[in-house]
């Protein structure tokens, strides 16, 4: 994405926050200091996003910190990885939940729930945010908004799984959409409702990469990607101008996008 386009997107997001419907739903503790995954490593976005959701959540969810070992963010993150991340995955054969490549959304949910059970707190659910057969992009948008708002309203800022895709052409093969890199962020602010005709909604999120609070937009892609036979997109765009997800791995001339793929929350 060019520098000029990034500036234009940031100006657009500023206008959306300033002029849109004044009803917003916020994380209960949205001003809390973000946790930086790099305290442990570049593959620790999952544990860091989990901690950011606990920290920016209501007092009930913040209680999860009391059962973690350690006295600072680095030690607590290392405790999560060691105590619940290294347990055997129920979803990936012969692998721990967390490894050098990071963690998948199902395993991250299981890790979070192990911590929550230890703290005698309710458990979380995972939702895949791809369009179901027969649904329209507008229905996917409405369902995504509903789930995110429900979790925020329950005091738990949802964890979003976002992925960078590239339309990649390999030798002797047709070009196909390929996952380049995945990442986890914590959603902390969104509009209470979608207006008629809306194709997306503005969000504020905590990015664990260097522990930043950022603005973005989630919505129906203007140009279809990972489309079905009717040319309709399978998922929603995550227009996150500040995100660095997989940018360095894009080949010259490749078409690329960041999409919302799943979420973990209280619904």
Where are these regions (language model features)?
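Predominantly the structural core of cysteine protease catalytic domains
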Residues: 92-191
